[in-house]
Amino acid sequence: MDFKYSDTVIHNGVVFYITDGGHRVYFLYGGCLLSVPRPHATAESGEIAKFGLTLRGLTHNDRVVANYVRSELNRTGRHESAPSSEEDVFVDRLEVLAQGAQAFGRDICGSFDLEVYDPYLAECMVSLKVTSGLIVSTGRDIPQDGMLHLYTVPTITNASSGFIYTPNIACFTLVQAYLTELPPELETLISGLFDHIPVARPPLRDESGGHSRTDIIVTSPRAVKTMAIGGTTRCSKRPLRKTVVSDFVQVRLIPKPCSIWDSASRVASGASLQSLQLLFKIADEIILIEEPWPGLDEHLNQARSTIVDAILAVYGNEGKLRFFGGKLTQQGVTTLQRFVLCQFILGKWNLINCYAALEQLAESYIGAVPEARDPLPDPHLVADAVNEIIRESGILGELCEIIVRYTQPTDPVNGSGSEVVELEARLLAEFAANATRVELGLSSYDEVRNMEARIASVLNKLYAKDGIGGAAQVACRILGSGLPVAIVLNVSSITAFDGLDLSRKGAYYLYYLLSERLKRGGVTVHVSRK
């Protein structure tokens, strides 16, 4: 859900978001969004509402996680904060648990991010054992658009490494709740707030008969569940038979997702080196520049935000997640440039990519800023950079398939210790087994773990900026064979511009890992069919 606001004000140390001409404010409370009207509002416009994710269970039919949070709140002495058995448990209760008995209303306000250090809750949310804690992000503020966005499914990252997990969607449900009154601590927090917020002057001819409704954009494909908290005249004791929308809400739009993903058939340049040179040069400018340039249409501007989400999913914040092309960073190649190189390779092989959207952004930017085109970077430098990525993914594919074919039940190889590498090693073992028609189900548990550990060792070398030489060196040691040296010679001859089978294999392994990272990062790859 998207919530439009016109301005912000800080009151009692908390940021409030002003909407509806000053008649209503939003504020963040433990990852949820509360909507509060101006005092003395009419019954129609005076509704207090709460929007946010609630905790459910391990499956769609149980409430294990919600019941656990209730019991923990009671066990730790926060009885007043524990919802009744009839009420859903909002994620703000997680912040109450994390901060303990000293937590006060203001301490829980102001952020979409929640910290979860309870090992049981962490495992329920991501289906993996986590010892370092989780950061659960329930939404984000987009100040340039004046918009607060609530996620249907949260983004969950490792509190230590920044690794992005795939959430257990059965654990969360987006809910709209009616509140008859605010808790006393929040009443105190907003006391005097509206004294500092002027009411927008209505037009001389106000045909609406009152102040305008608030625009809330519903983007979820599923209806938002509705519930009531406390007694209310508008809700009988009978359960609601359908989802209803708050009186102050006007659903204006259910938009299609911004479609940046496509096949190479729509790449205007045919994925040429010249187009790649231009994109390589201005990639950081067209994505990171804050203000839209003259002539940039709304769809392309929205595409920039979608591309940023994709880059964060693949490389993490500030590029902390290692990926192909790490060796290029030593030559000053940026994370955005590496992303462009990957999209070029995928476009060349008709795999789902966003290279056409990047080209359109570049064309629009050059139309507004012609001097940004020249001089183009050295074509040999750009070609070497994109070739490095296809060769790294190519040797990974070759070595993975050799490992799943010929791994023997020998002493296991030590893993890398990196969560992302170990997870991707498991995925690659299955992918390589399918490609070579090896039945992993016929192998023993120890054999499969040994395969995964060997793949992790190779992957770790590639991600650690050692390139194809480092990957071959570790492969020779763990396989006890010089075959990887011959593979290096073959891989060194492929390029991102040829049509060789080994190049195709590299593109497919690159696509598989990249698409899995997008999935874990919550980025939906919606393919245009226009």
Curated annotation (Swiss-Prot):
Broad class of the protein's primary localization: virion
Coiled-coil region: none
Keywords: Host cytoplasm, Host nucleus, Virion, Virion tegument
Localization: Virion tegument; Host cytoplasm; Host nucleus
Gene Ontology terms: cellular component: host cell cytoplasm; host cell nucleus; viral tegument
Record function comment: May participate in DNA packaging/capsid maturation events. Promotes efficient incorporation of tegument proteins UL46, UL49, and US3 homologs into virions. May also play a role in capsid transport to the trans-Golgi network (TGN).
Similarity section: Belongs to the alphaherpesvirinae UL21 protein family.
Subunit structure: Interacts (via C-terminus) with UL16.
Protein name, entry field: Tegument protein UL21 homolog
Species in which this protein is naturally found: Equine herpesvirus 1 (strain V592)
Lineage, top ranks: Viruses, Duplodnaviria, Heunggongvirae, Peploviricota, Herviviricetes
